[in-house]
From Swiss-Prot:
Biological source species: Emericella nidulans (strain FGSC A4 / ATCC 38163 / CBS 112.46 / NRRL 194 / M139) (Aspergillus nidulans)
Gene giving rise to this polypeptide: dbaD
Pfam families from the UniProt entry: MFS_1 (PF07690)
Residues with glycosylation annotation: 8, 421
Protein name: MFS-type transporter dbaD
Gene Ontology terms, MF aspect: transmembrane transporter activity
Membrane topology value: Multi-pass membrane protein
Length: 444
């Protein structure tokens, strides 16, 4: 048996040592790389995501309900002032301050309401940048200042600037906080909370006409309007004191969502709302003057038709909103549009004070839903919830065109036959509301 040469053993040993050294280096390299692996996984699995998501809305509690009170006061001094314009229309028609046609006078209220919607469209991005307090202060100042200037006005142009533009711009600054703050504090109870806040517009539409009617005799027009300005000042201090922006959007919303124009249900509902507001504002502007001019009632009672209508609308803005949480807003707003159209047409047959009061009560209830439900409808039509602010602003901006046209168009129809074409006015208001209801039923 032959023995292996000793050098073979030395070669094998050297090879084994080389292999062991390579294994050691490989193992050392592997071990050295292991601590880095979790870091690589962490950096790829957890990229920076920006600020943490805000907690869900509390849906109650002292702070949340204080914001409902603040929202109530905002609606009290925005839509509440708009709803009271019918009393100013009746007073201006008397010629005590200036002599102008019904259509010219209605431009004051129409511009005021249009400014509310259009300025609200542009101030949405300011709100998104976190300037809630600035909007509240500027809007409150414009409303109070506008009324103080209105108390000094003697001509149509002065009234148009003070009441139409100044008060309207102030209301527009407050409109976005009206509809944007509460959804950050309520989700499951949003309809109820928003309905309670929106009822402030009805309360304003009751109190402001009564104040003007009761004080204009003993104090005159100037001091009566100043008292309205002081009431606005006191009530607007409440939202300035209690309202805070709970959630600041990560970035300011775009002014226009171009995809909305190809969204057929959204555009159909916007068109329907535009037509509904045309008919509704014809009713709000002229029902008081109708009672005095026919004459169905005396002048004093004619002033109270607007507060009666707005008192009923308080229930129309709360009950349907609360029901919308259960059965959906579209199942309510469509029949309300149809009901308003029928009631406006019923004014063609009204010849007694009792009949006029009944129409005012019923149209106030169903008309209140036409103002309270659209924000919920726009929310329901927006699939991408990050675009809610944009879509609400766009929708109300387009609806503002109907508000702008509604009153003056009705005034032009009325003035066609020496301020007596009431048949044409009520047919115009009734048909536009009926068409709006049918569009919602068919297309949305």
């Amino acid at each position: 048996m032959t023995e292996q040469p000793p050098q073979n053993h030395s070669v094998d040993l050297n090879q084994n040592e080389d292999n062991n050294e390579n294994d050691y280096r490989s193992s050392s390299a592997t071990d050295a790389e292991r601590p880095c692996e979790p870091k690589i996984e962490e950096s790829t699995a957890k990229p920076p995501t920006g600020p943490p998501a805000p907690p869900p809305p509390p849906n109650g509690g002292l702070v949340a309900w204080l914001h409902v009170i603040g929202g109530f006061m905002l609606f009290f001094n925005t839509w509440g002032i708009m709803n009271a314009f019918g009393v100013f229309q009746t007073y201006y028609e008397s010629g005590a301050l200036f002599e102008r046609s019904s259509s010219d006078i209605s431009w004051i209220g129409s511009i005021q309401a249009t400014m509310l919607l259009l300025v609200g469209f542009f101030t949405g991005s300011i709100y998104d940048r976190g300037y809630l307090r600035a909007l509240l202060v500027v809007g409150s100042f414009c409303i109070v200042f506008g009324h103080m200037m209105l108390s000094l006005c003697k001509t149509y142009g002065q009234v148009l600037l003070a009441q139409g533009f100044c008060v309207g711009i102030g209301a527009g600054c407050l409109f976005v906080p009206c509809v944007s703050v509460l959804p950050t504090y309520f989700s499951s109870r949003l309809g109820t909370a928003l309905g309670l806040a929106v009822s402030g517009s009805s309360m304003g539409g009751v109190i402001y006409p009564i104040v003007l009617n009761e004080l204009i005799g003993p104090l005159g027009f100037g001091w009566s309007v100043r008292v309205i300005g002081f009431i606005a000042l006191g009530t607007l201090l409440v939202p300035i004191a209690v309202m805070k922006q709970r959630v600041k959007p990560p970035r300011a919303r775009a002014l226009i969502d171009w995809s909305a124009f190809s969204d057929i249900p959204y555009m159909a509902f916007t068109l329907a709302s535009l037509l509904a507001f045309m008919g509704l504002f014809a009713l709000l502007f002229y029902i008081s003057y109708f009672g005095a001019a026919k004459p169905i009632t005396d002048t004093r009672m004619a002033f109270y038709i607007v507060p009666i209508l707005n008192a009923a609308s308080c229930f129309g803005r709360t009950i349907p909103n609360a029901m919308a949480d259960k059965i959906g807003p579209f199942n309510l707003i469509a029949p309300c549009c149809l009901a308003v159209g029928v009631l406006i047409l019923c004014l063609l047959a009204v010849t007694t004070e009792a009949g006029l009061i009944v129409i005012a009560l019923l149209s106030g209830f169903f008309g209140g839903a036409l103002i309270g439900l659209p924000p919920l409808c726009f929310v329901a039509l927006t699939k991408d919830k990050t675009k809610i602010g944009t879509r609400i602003g766009m929708g109300f901006g387009m609806v503002g065109l109907g508000v702008l046209a509604g009153g003056p168009a009705g005034g032009a129809i009325l003035s066609h036959s020496h301020h007596s074409n009431w048949t044409g006015l009520w047919v115009y208001g009734g048909v536009t509301s009926l068409v709006a209801g049918f569009i919602i039923c068919i297309a949305v």
